[in-house]
């Protein structure tokens, strides 16, 4: 194992780079994992970029619901890209290191985009509430200006929260081991490596994660409570079917994303929890961003129509 590179500050040395252990230390599995996660990443990039392109070029998809979906696709793409390239390089490299600065940057974007996605999913639930419970007021209430603010709000709040959390991480001192038992720079394993008092950082992490997780989930649950009441009051079976169909994809995405993150953050950073968090992290870092475009397009006639329209246009142009 490589010795930690250190920078002398005062009477002690500071770690200037970390070693990422990754998912496994078995060398025979590294090439297989490289191929697996490369395929997942290519599907993620293709699916989310494709969703954004379809929404951009098809006028039928220029509605609030699809603007929010395009924003979610952008988040998922950035979310996965923050971790995957470095992880793929490490699968084929003997030197699985990441600099202290790069580690902080990865931490920052991870936290920022997780919190942003919390509230983007909440915004999408609110949009469904407005469409189903207030259909006559939907166009006026969900104007272009309102949509821009509803998209910008989660981004601004998420990236400011990420900056605050990263500043607390920056204040930690790392002067011992530099081995991170994870495949990316995550707060729990970093906290375990710190040789300074981590109480403030741990408290901040649990408060911020707990508040944003519960607050955004509360918005989603309240929105769907009113949606359920509105659906049960519908006399038309076809109307109820369409309403459930509209909400089904979002509910699946919410369950996958929130379920895995809830398991991740409600536990203290112990040896066992870090090992478990690596498995859980695979789902929300790779599986969820890959599945979201599929989930949202599988039963969506508008998206499928836009896709085949684009395919026919390209085929006929040749």
UniProtKB/Swiss-Prot annotation:
PROSITE patterns: G_PROTEIN_RECEP_F1_1, G_PROTEIN_RECEP_F1_2. InterPro entries: GPCR_Rhodpsn, GPCR_Rhodpsn_7TM, Olfact_rcpt. Residues 53-60, 127-139, 224-243, 299-318 are cytoplasmic. Its main location: membrane. It is found in: Cell membrane. Keywords: Cell membrane, Disulfide bond, G-protein coupled receptor, Glycoprotein, Membrane, Olfaction, Receptor, Sensory transduction, Transducer, Transmembrane, Transmembrane helix. Potential odorant receptor. Residues 1-31, 82-105, 161-202, 265-277 are extracellular. Disulfide bonds join 103-195. It comes from Mus musculus (Mouse). Signal peptide: none annotated. It is a multi-pass membrane protein. GO terms for biological process: G protein-coupled receptor signaling pathway; sensory perception of smell. The chain crosses the membrane at residues 32-52, 61-81, 106-126, 140-160, 203-223, 244-264, 278-298. CDD domains: 7tmA_OR5M-like. GO terms for cellular component: membrane; plasma membrane. This is Olfactory receptor 5M5. GO terms for molecular function: G protein-coupled receptor activity; olfactory receptor activity. It comes from the Eukaryota. Glycans are attached at residue 11.
